[in-house]
């Protein structure tokens, strides 16, 4: 486990990780705020061309401490908190927009979950499967909450940040297409099993919808 600190939480969380000499830290692309002079950085591309086209690829940055231990400070894009899990030969699934960083010993793969056929064909939910032993960090838009899944739990897709192994889910449309078009409610995840789901109290789609109402609109002239 790497030593780390999370400051400025919960609204504007900043993650600082101490990377031991010779060790590597993997971070969301472009999220590095600052780093020690001895840190070597290189870009990685996971997934290949086919997955890039289908949006299943993942861009990350690799940081390696050379000569002695160094630090990397990470500032995720959304305004919110940062969560941490220490995996011990375990699995966690993270929404792609919530991934922040992970250490060596944890492998990852991407999964594109299609939400529908027809009206929203092509829309989907991009998950990152993290497996192994090490540290994993993820961020939220708004506050971060942990919910226990002991039986069944229904959560709006836009609020899901991550969930642990032991939890299964089905993606369903809530209330049919009329609800999707007129109420703003769309797809939800129905979780079952035993485990935890991490949610965010805000979702980007709601912010976009709210801001759109104040968008200047040019009046048409006859």
Please place each PLM-identified region on the residue numbering.
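Composition-driven recognition of glycine/serine/threonine/acidic- and proline-rich low-complexity segments
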Residues: 1-222
């Amino acid at each position: 486990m790497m030593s780390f600190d999370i400051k400025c939480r919960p609204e504007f969380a900043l993650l600082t990780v101490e990377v031991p000499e010779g060790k590597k830290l993997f971070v969301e692309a472009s999220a590095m705020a600052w780093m020690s002079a001895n840190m070597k950085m290189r870009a990685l591309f996971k997934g290949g061309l086919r997955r890039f086209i289908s949006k299943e690829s993942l861009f990350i940055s690799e940081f390696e401490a050379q000569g002695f231990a160094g630090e990397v400070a990470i500032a995720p894009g959304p305004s919110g908190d940062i969560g941490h899990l220490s995996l011990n030969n375990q699995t966690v699934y993270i929404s792609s927009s919530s991934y922040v960083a992970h250490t060596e010993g944890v492998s990852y793969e991407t999964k594109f979950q299609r939400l529908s056929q027809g009206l929203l064909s092509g829309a989907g939910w991009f998950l990152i499967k993290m497996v192994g032993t090490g540290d994993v960090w993820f961020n939220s838009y708004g506050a971060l909450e942990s919910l226990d899944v002991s039986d069944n739990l229904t959560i709006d897709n836009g609020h899901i940040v991550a969930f642990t192994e032991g939890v299964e889910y089905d993606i369903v449309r809530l209330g049919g297409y009329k609800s999707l078009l007129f109420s703003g409610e769309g797809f939800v995840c129905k979780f079952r099993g035993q485990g935890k789901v991490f949610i965010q109290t805000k979702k980007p789609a709601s912010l976009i919808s709210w801001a759109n109402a104040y968008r200047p609109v040019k009046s048409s002239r006859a």
